[in-house]
């Protein structure tokens, strides 16, 4: 397995977007689909998912994953900074998630009071290559 630096990953994303006629949001959807399929295959016995999203493109991945997992029957909660300035792609996927209408989207502050049940998967979509 080759391990890439954050800069190399950004360059790979930009190369793919530029040379494959794939938009950034489409690339994000592909990544979310791959993550969703991995979760379904590997942690199918857990149906509760909490996703923590930042405000960059990694958050956009998290919002897309939340939407996809919900459509597969998982119980999903999303925690994010509701007053954040989201990246363009993250804002688009947050809008799509809100339009779905049946997923709890909570501010980070609620995480301190939340009771995380046993057998709940927690997904980190806070930090990406921009960290």
Q: Locations of the language-model features?
A:
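Glycine-rich phosphate/dinucleotide-binding loop and adjoining beta-alpha-beta core of small-molecule
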Residues: 2-4, 44-131
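Positively charged, low-complexity intrinsically disordered leader regions
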Residues: 1-46
């Amino acid at each position: 397995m080759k391990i890439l630096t954050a800069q190399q990953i950004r360059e790979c994303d930009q190369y793919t977007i530029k040379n494959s006629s794939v938009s950034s949001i489409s690339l994000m959807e592909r990544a979310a689909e791959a993550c969703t399929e991995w979760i379904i295959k590997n942690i199918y016995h857990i149906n509760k998912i909490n996703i923590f999203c930042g405000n960059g493109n990694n958050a956009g991945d998290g919002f897309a994953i939340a939407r996809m997992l919900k459509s597969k029957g998982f119980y999903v909660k999303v925690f994010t900074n509701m007053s954040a300035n989201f990246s363009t792609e993250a804002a688009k996927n947050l809008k799509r998630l809100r339009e779905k209408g049946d997923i709890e989207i909570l501010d980070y502050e609620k995480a301190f009071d939340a009771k995380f049940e046993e057998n709940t998967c927690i997904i980190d979509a806070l930090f990406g290559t921009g960290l």
